[in-house]
Amino acid sequence: MNSSLATYWRALASGTRRSLPDRSLLSLLVPFSLLYALIQRLRAVLYRVRLLKSRRLPRPVISVGNLTVGGTGKTPVTAHIARWLLAEGYRVAVLSRGYGGSLEGHTAVVSDGRTVMMEAEQCGDEPFLLSSTIPGLMVVMGSDRFSAGMLAMEQLAPDVFLLDDGYQHLRLTRDLNILLLDHALPFGNGWTLPAGVLREPTSAAGRADLVIRTRCPRIAPCPSPLPGIPSCTARHSLGNVIPLGNGAAFPMESLRGRRVLAFAGIADPYGFFEELREQGLNLVAELAMPDHVAYDDNRIAEIGRRLHGSGAEFAVTTEKDGVKLLGLQRECAEKILLARLELIIADPAPLTDALRNLLQK
């Protein structure tokens, strides 16, 4: 799916497009969504009555996931929890599918906590980003997260597992189930795929032990859409900027008013562009690409053309995109800056209490 079609579908499925032609197209997709929802409900029931089996790892498992396709900030939340656990002295292993990597489907160690053993194009964006930015964090990839966890037990001896994007991975038993919900559109338009953005019906939210409401505005309250389940409020903030390759990080504020090309291949590139504008950057050109995009020669050439043709002083992208550009040897490489995304949890007590209660058992 190209970026413009993906953007249109996301607007349609999230309920932000409501014209008559849009509603007509949506109505054609609804029967498929009803069938998809029925299949997902049946699958959940089969796991609940144990006709489909979940397997348990010998160490506690903390799952971080969501109900919708696209970005709700899973990787920043996973990174935040990983850093907290490491600071508490635990040996932490992240279990990731390795989506988008050339070795997707293989079970392998991405990082042993000291050495990153793969490139981003092999293991995927998120495992490489976590491995390369969090010292001491172990990362194992595999479509079967139980097998990945057992490999980690054999080779790395972790104290606790973090299951990245694991809400629907019911084959693995988890001890703490954390659900992320976008503040503005927690359930999209309410439909499952393909008429909506839901991976499961909204009733699946009841499996959560803790809800983290992401992308909350700085000052507006974020009431929980799931009363009775403990919840936290989180927002994302762009922190320091890091030059691609060599160079020291510097504050985003130093780019205020500067002419920049913004590009990103993430779930919500336009949200990233808007955050750059809020920081005071002058976006003279934008280049939105599909999530998990591969930066081949054609993509690199397009970035170079946009950079020079727009008169931009710099090109700014996300740190997640940047991990796929580290080996870039091009004239424009010295002008590419990586924006670091930081997670701020305003009320962390429900999260830290849940983590401590689990690990002190």
From Swiss-Prot:
Sorted UniProt keywords: ATP-binding, Kinase, Lipid A biosynthesis, Lipid biosynthesis, Lipid metabolism, Nucleotide-binding, Transferase
Lineage start: Bacteria, Pseudomonadati, Thermodesulfobacteriota, Desulfuromonadia, Desulfuromonadales
GO molecular function, one term: tetraacyldisaccharide 4'-kinase activity
Similarity remark: Belongs to the LpxK family.
Pathway annotation from the record: Glycolipid biosynthesis; lipid IV(A) biosynthesis; lipid IV(A) from (3R)-3-hydroxytetradecanoyl-[acyl-carrier-protein] and UDP-N-acetyl-alpha-D-glucosamine: step 6/6
Pfam families, A to Z: LpxK
Gene from which this protein is expressed: lpxK
EC number: 2.7.1.130
InterPro entries cross-referenced by the UniProt entry: LpxK, P-loop_NTPase
One cellular component (GO) term of this entry: plasma membrane
One GO process term, biological-process aspect: lipopolysaccharide core region biosynthetic process
Reaction equations catalysed: a lipid A disaccharide + ATP = a lipid IVA + ADP + H(+)
The protein's name: Tetraacyldisaccharide 4'-kinase
Positions of ATP binding: 68-75
Chain's role: Transfers the gamma-phosphate of ATP to the 4'-position of a tetraacyldisaccharide 1-phosphate intermediate (termed DS-1-P) to form tetraacyldisaccharide 1,4'-bis-phosphate (lipid IVA).
Domain of life according to the entry: Bacteria
